[in-house]
A protein has these predicted regions:
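Class I SAM-dependent methyltransferase Rossmann-like catalytic core
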Residues: 1-19
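S-adenosyl-L-methionine-dependent methyltransferase catalytic module, highlighting the catalytic core
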Residues: 4, 75, 98-242
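Intrinsic-disorder/low-complexity coil detector
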Residues: 6, 11, 29, 50, ...
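Conserved SAM-binding loop
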Residues: 14-129
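N-terminal low-hydrophobic presequence detector
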Residues: 2-3, 30-31, 49, 86, ...
Length: 243
């Protein structure tokens, strides 16, 4: 296990540098905030509270990259074959499960993920409960039951194969979105399951045919060969007056 300590100003950037750019993401319990790290992927969001997903659907305006499943995490993940998604994200989620369910979720995430698991959670137990069923959650919605904290997590809960980033001043707001007198710590836990692989789909930013072909060649040819081909093609364009 590797444990790195970072202040709030540095931790998010440090974590982002460890997350792989992949094609297919399974996002467990995202609430109204799907994982923000990867934006070019097929993004499967699983949440037990339907109003959260309905809000995501409105705010994403029908973005076809999002697949929204209204189910509990264990109902949904059990339908996925082994190694059927690239990465599993569980951000601000595992603390809402009791400890045994949380450990079971990590095992299931390892089963279905090809490349990486990414977890974010408070460091240790951070009390948060909604005993009054009529009390709205922090977003003014009726998801209090799902926002109750039922477990606390520390680096040792994850095991030797995990990469941990701890931030002792990460969480500044309480469950009512009010500033706390003293920030609460949090941690990111990342488990990398396989060597890095290139994305399987070329994203075309320039719609021209040449730009698309150039991207494919750059991806597939050794760098010296591509640079030589690019130089020769540039010379041709200059000679015919199209450079």
């Amino acid at each position: 296990m590797t444990v790195t300590y970072a202040p709030r100003t540095d931790a998010p950037r440090l974590v982002a540098g460890k997350i792989r750019d992949v094609d297919v993401v399974l996002d467990l319990g995202p609430g109204i905030s799907p994982q923000p790290y990867l934006t070019r992927c097929l993004h499967i969001c699983v949440d037990a509270h339907r109003p959260y997903l309905e809000r995501v659907a409105r705010e994403r305006a029908g973005d076809p990259r999002y697949v929204l499943l209204n189910a509990t995490w264990d109902q949904a993940i059990g339908m996925f074959p082994d190694k059927s998604v690239d990465s599993v994200f569980a951000l601000d989620f595992i603390e809402h499960l009791d400890k045994q369910d949380g450990l079971r979720m990590l095992r299931e995430a390892e089963r279905v993920a090809r490349q990486q698991i990414v977890v974010f959670t408070p460091h240790g137990f951070f009390p948060q409960s909604y005993d009054d069923p009529g009390k709205p959650d922090r977003w003014g919605m009726d998801g209090g039951y799902w926002q109750t904290h039922r477990s606390g997590w520390a680096p040792d809960d994850f095991g030797d194969d995990w990469d941990i980033v701890v931030c002792h001043d990460c969480i500044e707001l309480d469950q009512n979105n009010q500033p706390m007198a003293r920030p609460v710590g949090a941690l990111w836990a990342l488990r990398t399951l396989s060597p890095p692989t290139p994305r399987r789909h070329q994203v075309v930013k320039d719609p021209s045919v040449w730009a698309h072909v150039k991207g494919l060649l750059e991806q597939g040819l050794p760098p010296p060969v591509f640079r030589r081909l690019q130089s020769v093609w540039g010379g041709v364009l200059r000679r015919i007056g199209r450079a």
